[in-house]
Amino acid sequence: MIELQFTKMHGAGNDFVFVDCLKNDIGNLAAIAKKLCDRRFGVGADQLLTVHPSEVADFKMEIYNADGSQVEMCGNGIRCFAKYVCDHGLTKKKELEVETLAGIIRPRLVGDLVEVDMGEPILEGRKIPVEADGQIADRLL
C-alpha cells in the first residue's frame, strides 16, 4: 500500500480528488482513480484530477472518472484545478494556461472565484457528439 497525499474539492455539485504529480510518478492513474473515487470504500469523488508539468502551458491537467476512464475536460474541474494550483503555491499567476486533452484552457482567478471561457455552447441536439448503443432521440420529452 502506498501513502498518497491528496486534496478533495468541489465545484457546483461535482467533487474531485486532486493529486500533485509534478514531481512524483504515482503509477497507474486509472487504477488509482477507481480506488480513490469509490464512494463506499475510497474517499469518494466524481473524478480524480492530477497536476502535471507541461511543455506547452503552465500545467497539464489529467482527468479520470470514478470508473478509471480518462476524459478530455470538465468545466467545474478546471475551475477547481486553477484554485488548487494557486492555493497550494504552485503559481502566483492569476491567468493560467492549462493543457488538457481538449486543448489549452485559460482559467482566470477573480478574487476567490475562477472564470473559464468554455466557448459557445452546442444547443442543437444533432450537433452534440454522443456515443450510445441504440437509437438516439432528437426531441425534448
What are these language model-derived features?
Residues 1-111:
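A glycine-rich beta-to-alpha transition motif near the start of alpha/beta enzyme domains, typified by
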Residues 90, 99-141:
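ATP-dependent small-molecule kinase catalytic core of the GHMP/sugar-kinase superfamily
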